[in-house]
């Protein structure tokens, strides 16, 4: 099990993207959408080699004729058959490895249902015959990647956001807050406000176009009201985007109105605190002695923290909530899109971690519930 020549696999299963690769690498080898697509129409061409399902980039490129489904919603696997397809694709098509030869480190969202990690464990050992596996919490890995052991991680991906306070390497579960508001909701909101401008995006395939618009053109305003006035009085904030059919659309205040929903969830009709307030509430649930260390180490991670301007806005909002003399530092590493994966790569290659793996033998003796005893 502890042979040095067998690299562990690290798979970060996000709601939007799967990041996969080998422990010890500095970036994931394979990054592809967590999508399974099935044809919407009957195949008429014989010998075309049509498949009954497509995964990842192939599903994305054929999206015009497919119905796209995401098996992971809000960080929780809702469709295990599709999830198995995605893992199969990861091992055999993307990484080209035999899963029975490599230990595998999987990631999961904090506060996930226990049954979820048991099922993950079961599939790895029984379907893919993994020699060993481990399930790690995403936010903790992001903190590893930033080179810290204490801090509060705001992790926001496509399906779910969390604030996770971590002290000396331990996540503090009573203070973890979860917000079901993330990239996919922002994409849907952008679809809605673009419709108000007269552009119609409705299908699952068109949603992917809007996601691309969001990733390329959106940003977070430092002062929302001020920015709205600027947008109304001049066209300096307008940008154009070319759709796949060559039509060009113009997008103005939508560029910062969409990500603003992170700070003002009522925009989406959600009655919850914004991300700045959620971070603050999370810190306030911690012991008074460690709050200073958390304020000074607010780490952003995940794809939905990639909007330009988000770190400055967080700094401004948290400063307004915190005690006046408190030193507040927002850490936004440039590679934060992949920091969960990078943290997993670091963890799985530590020599001290090697006794933490759940081995096939232990699984055979104890069954899926072993995961709660060995992974925390």
From Swiss-Prot:
Gene3D superfamilies: 3.30.420.40, Actin, Chain A, domain 4. Keywords: Acetylation, ATP-binding, Cytoplasm, Cytoskeleton, Hydrolase, Nucleotide-binding. InterPro entries: Actin, Actin/actin-like_CS, Actin_CS, ATPase_NBD. It is found in: Cytoplasm, Cytoskeleton. Its main location: cytoplasm. It catalyses: ATP + H2O = ADP + phosphate + H(+). Actins are highly conserved proteins that are involved in various types of cell motility and are ubiquitously expressed in all eukaryotic cells. This is Actin-15A. The lineage of its organism: Eukaryota, Metazoa, Echinodermata, Eleutherozoa, Echinozoa.
